[in-house]
């Protein structure tokens, strides 16, 4: 789950003016991709120059390309973003259809509120898509942040001690085509209860992360 969170936050002024838009990927125009790419470069750049590289020019995705996006706009342009991609993952030995959530980023003045608002816009779409679960994976450094924003509000369950295997978005002669990461798995129950999530300590995306 590509996620960018700024280390600082401003006051809450301007949060009420954010307008949330649910956009299918085929609805986006070149200008939309260019605006989103610039937003991601500014959001992911502070976390490391390498993290901003996928968004060169007008590319508005990093690994797998989302099919649906929730985008928050205000007078300053793009304020927040989260993407969705339906896919099958393997949890242990069980093949499971999920909606992977990723490409999350928020401007500093919305920090602490962006993901909660975005998920409230996204959740009805998850229900309409008929998926049993929303799924994401974040590095352990963001555990407290996600606990505060989604787990305590009852939006999701955080699972620890899980390893996720993904393919790289491109093939490099000097790198393995797959990588395995120890991450925090975030599960959003949609069509099923969290008790129906399969047991397993290894999840295979069989593709690049969103």
UniProtKB/Swiss-Prot annotation:
Domain of life: Bacteria
The enzyme's E.C. designation: 2.3.1.-
Pfam families: NodA
Cellular compartments per GO CC: cytosol
Localization per Swiss-Prot or TrEMBL: Cytoplasm
GO molecular function: acyltransferase activity
Keywords for this protein: Acyltransferase, Cytoplasm, Nodulation, Transferase
Enzyme class: transferase
PROSITE patterns for this protein: NODA
Reported function: N-acyltransferase required for nodulation. Acts in the production of a small, heat-stable compound (Nod) that stimulates mitosis in various plant protoplasts.
Family stated for the protein in its record: Belongs to the NodA family.
Listed name of the protein: Nodulation protein A
Annotated source species: Bradyrhizobium diazoefficiens (strain JCM 10833 / BCRC 13528 / IAM 13628 / NBRC 14792 / USDA 110)
